Amino acid sequence: MSPCKLLPFCVALALTGCSLAPDYQRPAMPVPQQFSLSQNGLVNAADNYQNAGWRTFFVDNQVKTLISEALVNNRDLRMAALKVQEARAQYRLTDADRYPQLNGEGSGSWSGNLKGDSATTREFSTGLNASFDLDFFGRLKNMSEAERQNYLATEEAQRAVHILLVSNVAQSYFNQQLAYAQLQIAEETLRNYQQSYAFVEKQLLTGSSNVLALEQARGVIESTRSDIAKRQGELAQANNALQLLLGSYGKLPQAQTVNSDSLQSVKLPAGLPSQILLQRPDIMEAEHALMAANANIGAARAAFFPSISLTSGISTASSDLSSLFNASSGMWNFIPKIEIPIFNAGRNQANLDIAEIRQQQSVVNYEQKIQNAFKEVADALALRQSLNDQISAQQRYLASLQITLQRARTLYQHGAVSYLEVLDAERSLFATRQTLLDLNYARQVNEISLYTALGGGWQQ
């Protein structure tokens, strides 16, 4: 049988060669089968949870605009996309080793002696060379599969960066709006303190108050000015953080009215299975890494067996270009080669041990990812009801403080209480308003965290 007829048969045989990689089995989830949920924000148990696109989840148009801008300009996302391209090219490079390689060559030479008393000798040659490794034991196949899984892992890593960016931009925007609101409250409180100071000063002139009350009024004014300076610094830092995420330094949003309607509530079925975590890109990335490690075991096992390569070529040579392709000037060759590992001081066994250990590490990493994801969802669910209860209590407390302050001012005007009573009521009201803002912001961030922990933020 000629080499040309033998080569296709060898190619087909090698491409369908066996694989020594262990059969892949997804590790069991090391977490409970279901989440323990309260009744807040749940839908019917028969309904299935589906992640809404971020354009649906975020109702605030300003948030949508900022996220769209960040997805275009953010450098972290660009870097993730470039890593995907690199991994895709690496996979193509490794996979190319599984197929025959064909190369052409041509050359010409001229020679003669320096005296010039003899004719110049000319020699021309051309040829084709083919080489192919017979992958009977799946070494190249498993190496290619490992690179394919690495490529798929980088795609999931890009999705994770995308989701994290959507979450961070939204949280950064709400943090900026919180800084605006805190600054506004501090400025309003300063104006109220200044009015109180003017009133106390007037009473001092009429003898209805004393210098101590006036100094107390001046003290809270200066304290509030200090708080305003602090809030201005926080606002500047929030703006800087938002610009970094956006990847541009254009005009930033000004103070907006932000409330609970700025995003949708994540509604979950009462029997939410933990299996839903498997759609998270970081967990899918870890699983692809595990599958790559599994394939590397197959490649390491194949190193214990013989490797066979085939080399074949045809060539012609002539001193005249016109007769270069004459049949009489051509020749062919076929060179099969086999390499059998005999002694390598335990190198192959060490490589196999490394591959198996790395596969075990990948299993641990996969399980850790699932446990961390379960904790993130469980924490967000636990915090959701707690924040709602805290906000309700703070709202009632705020209403009570407003009444207390009004009555304290009335009693002070009639001389029934000292200015210290008014001052305490004003301070409590100021602190409670700021606390309520912090709680509302925390509720928004927690809802975004729950949405992200469940894998939301990839689709529009």
Curated annotation (Swiss-Prot):
A lipid is attached at C18 (S-diacylglycerol cysteine). A lipid is attached at C18 (N-palmitoyl cysteine). Keywords: Cell outer membrane, Ion transport, Lipoprotein, Membrane, Palmitate, Porin, Signal, Transmembrane, Transmembrane beta strand, Transport. It is a multi-pass membrane protein; Lipid-anchor. Its main location: membrane. GO terms for cellular component: cell outer membrane; pore complex. GO terms for biological process: monoatomic ion transport; protein homotrimerization. InterPro entries: OMF (IPR050737), OMP_efflux (IPR003423), RND_efflux_OM_lipoprot_NodT (IPR010131). Pfam families: OEP (PF02321). It comes from the Bacteria. Induction: Transcriptionally regulated by CusR in response to copper and silver ions. GO terms for molecular function: diacylglycerol binding; efflux transmembrane transporter activity; porin activity. It is found in: Cell outer membrane. Residues 1-17 form the signal peptide. NCBIfam families: outer_NodT, PRK09837.1. Belongs to the outer membrane factor (OMF) (TC 1.B.17) family. Forms pores that allow passive diffusion of cations across the outer membrane. Part of a cation efflux system that mediates resistance to copper and silver. Homotrimer. Component of the cus efflux system composed of CusA, CusB, CusC and CusF. This is Cation efflux system protein CusC.
